[in-house]
Amino acid sequence: MAEVSSAPVRRPFHRRRKTCPFSGANAPRIDYKDVRLLQRYISERGKIVPSRITAVSQKKQRELAQAIKRARFLGLLPYVVS
């Protein structure tokens, strides 16, 4: 006879699927002049935060990176935070 353990059965943890903050009806547009928006996607060290952390879609992540690089080139954002 097989013994039945008395340990409680754990339900699997379901992580809520993140949605892209730039998709949808009233989503903000990615613009290199909008420094406040771009700073939310830059780390404390000045690096661009990856999309797996920010949940930005692949297409919008490329647009975001291009806007950040453009703003850096124009001097609106720093390359390195000192």
Curated annotation (Swiss-Prot):
The keyword Ribonucleoprotein applies. GO terms for molecular function: small ribosomal subunit rRNA binding; structural constituent of ribosome. GO terms for biological process: translation. InterPro entries: Ribosomal_bS18, Ribosomal_bS18_CS, Ribosomal_bS18_sf. GO terms for cellular component: cytosolic small ribosomal subunit. It comes from the Bacteria. PROSITE patterns: RIBOSOMAL_S18. Keywords: Ribonucleoprotein, Ribosomal protein, RNA-binding, rRNA-binding. Part of the 30S ribosomal subunit. Forms a tight heterodimer with protein bS6. Binds as a heterodimer with protein bS6 to the central domain of the 16S rRNA, where it helps stabilize the platform of the 30S subunit. Belongs to the bacterial ribosomal protein bS18 family. This is Small ribosomal subunit protein bS18. It comes from Sinorhizobium fredii (strain NBRC 101917 / NGR234).
